[in-house]
Amino acid sequence: MEAVSTLARHIRDEMGKVVVGQEDLKTECLLTLLCQGHALLEGVPGLAKPLAIKTLSRLLGLEFQRVQCTSDLMPADIIGTNVMHLADSTFRLHRGPVFTHLLLVDEINRMPPRTQAALLECMEERQVTIDGARHELSSFFTVFATQNPIDFEGTYQLPEAQLDRFLVKIRVGYPGADEEVRLLSTVHSGFDAHDLDAADLRPVAPDLLVSARKEARSVTVQESLITYVVQLARRTRQWPALSLGASPRAAVSLMRVAQALAAIDGRTYVVPDDVKQAMLPVLRHRVIVRPEADLEGMDADQILLDVIRAVEVPR
């Protein structure tokens, strides 16, 4: 697991020059890339979510584009359109921001449904359809979408089909007191988040991510642990506080993220703790809490922890 370990260590060290704290954010963004998935980042404004993704793209030498979602955003604004050139009366493709490697979709819960549907095709198929013609996207194409908590004005919930396309949902919280002091001290010393060149970031070799992905996929999952993953997923479907449990797609994602966690830890095999650690980020956005449980103050994370405790761990 040399490539994964090298990549993980480098990403954490270099991102630490720009993003203070937020270790879970760094790890789960890396997991997203290792598993070739997409990530939904939820947190209030001002927690460095866009900065983290921009820094990640710089470190990996990948192209970066950003879409700021508004209620009038059209599908053509993100996928592109054919434009007529008057000089020769021919149509030429004007590529939208999805033709990139890392796409930051800021405040995705302000995006209108038609545009969400266009983005869904990009995420699921890694291709776009423009005027009936299909165009392939990069194998590195990854969506990092941010959203504010649902009780913020002007936002609305994403449909289940859209949520299920995100490998993980990353909850970005406030930094600790010591981390916030370090952050302010860094800014006071002259750090400018808009000038990443001044951070002296050291990018990794271009093929390191490709090698790391292959290593993560090669991690062994014993039959007993595959059964454990299935039991966890099936238990969520029967859990009284949930109206919607984890789908088979979610179970596959749970196994893949557990493999990547094992690889980051330098192991060639998955252990039960990898599955437990993957459970919350992989499933918290795929299950639906019943209204009566929500009124009692229960949230998806609490319920998933109860599910983990209820399922016997393989030995």
Q: Can you describe what each PLM-predicted range is?
A:
Residues E28-L31, M84-L104:
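Conserved alpha-helical scaffold flanking the Walker A/P-loop in AAA+ ATPase domains
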Residues E2-L47, R234:
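Pre-Walker A (pre-P-loop) alpha-helix and adjacent loop at the N terminus of AAA/AAA+ ATPase modules
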Residues V44, I78, T146:
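P-loop (Walker A) phosphate-binding loop of NTP-binding proteins
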Residues H85-T90, M111, M123-V219, Q259-I264:
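Canonical AAA+ ATPase core
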Residues A39, L103, F141:
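Conserved beta-strand position immediately N-terminal to the Walker
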Residues G43, D106-E107, A118:
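Walker B catalytic acidic pair
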